[in-house]
């Protein structure tokens, strides 16, 4: 966006995290919905994740359940621990587009992230709100390692780095050998943005 302000035209590819289980989304109601993250093996590193929703009126409550059965209510204000050696950092910020984003980091005892499932339960008294989650892990190939187990990942709405500029021309990977059944490549972002803006 900064270079666009200087008159430079940007044409960039759009990545996709859904087909490799690094992006998932679902509607959250007052009864609560969970995002389940799977860590396939105990290794050094951390879970790095972000969750985003439209607007700033969602006011969620988020509870983390770790593989050892400990639960902790996120405060969105920095560091916490579950009492069993797992450390958590969480923070809630407003984005430039007026949405809210929850950033979450989970660290294991002595830097070793514990194998198993980490469940994040979102609840809110606000109207039904669509919550999106993105994540990355510290090891493995792009399509391996830490991933969402639920909700089911989806290619829709995934417009990822480097295709994240508001003003760039964003290009998808598109296949159409005979023009009878065109499709996006699974590694390509498809959009739209979570606010419905068409970006690809």
Segments predicted by a language model, with ranges:
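Short acidic, glycine-rich surface-loop motifs adjacent to enzyme active sites
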Residues: 1, 13-14, 121-125
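Anion (oxyanion) recognition and catalysis
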Residues: 4
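Extracellular S/T/G-rich loop segment that most often corresponds to the catalytic His/Ser-adjacent loop
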Residues: 7, 20-114, 122-123, 148-200
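Active-site neighborhood of phospho(di)ester-bond hydrolases with catalytic His/Asp-centered motifs
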Residues: 11-15, 171-172
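Edge beta-strands of jelly-roll/beta-sandwich modules across compartments, strongly enriched
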Residues: 127-140
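A short "linker-to-beta-strand initiation" element
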Residues: 138-150
């Amino acid at each position: 966006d900064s270079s666009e302000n200087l008159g430079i035209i940007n044409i960039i590819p759009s990545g996709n995290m859904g087909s490799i289980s690094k992006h998932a989304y679902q509607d959250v109601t007052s009864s609560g919905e969970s995002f389940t993250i799977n860590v396939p093996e105990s290794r050094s590193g951390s879970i790095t994740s972000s969750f985003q929703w439209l607007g700033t009126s969602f006011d969620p409550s988020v509870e983390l359940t770790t593989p050892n059965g400990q639960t902790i209510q996120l405060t969105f204000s920095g560091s916490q621990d579950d009492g069993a050696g797992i450390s958590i950092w969480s923070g809630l910020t407003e984005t430039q587009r007026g949405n809210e984003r929850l950033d979450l980091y989970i660290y294991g005892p002595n830097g070793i992230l514990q194998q198993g499932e980490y469940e994040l339960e979102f609840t809110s008294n606000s109207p039904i709100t669509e919550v999106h989650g993105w994540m990355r892990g510290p090891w493995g190939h792009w399509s391996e390692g830490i991933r969402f187990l639920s909700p089911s990942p989806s290619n829709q709405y995934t417009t990822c780095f480097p295709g994240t500029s508001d003003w760039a021309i964003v290009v998808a990977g598109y296949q159409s050998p005979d023009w009878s059944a065109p499709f996006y490549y699974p590694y390509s972002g498809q959009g739209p943005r979570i606010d419905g803006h068409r970006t690809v």
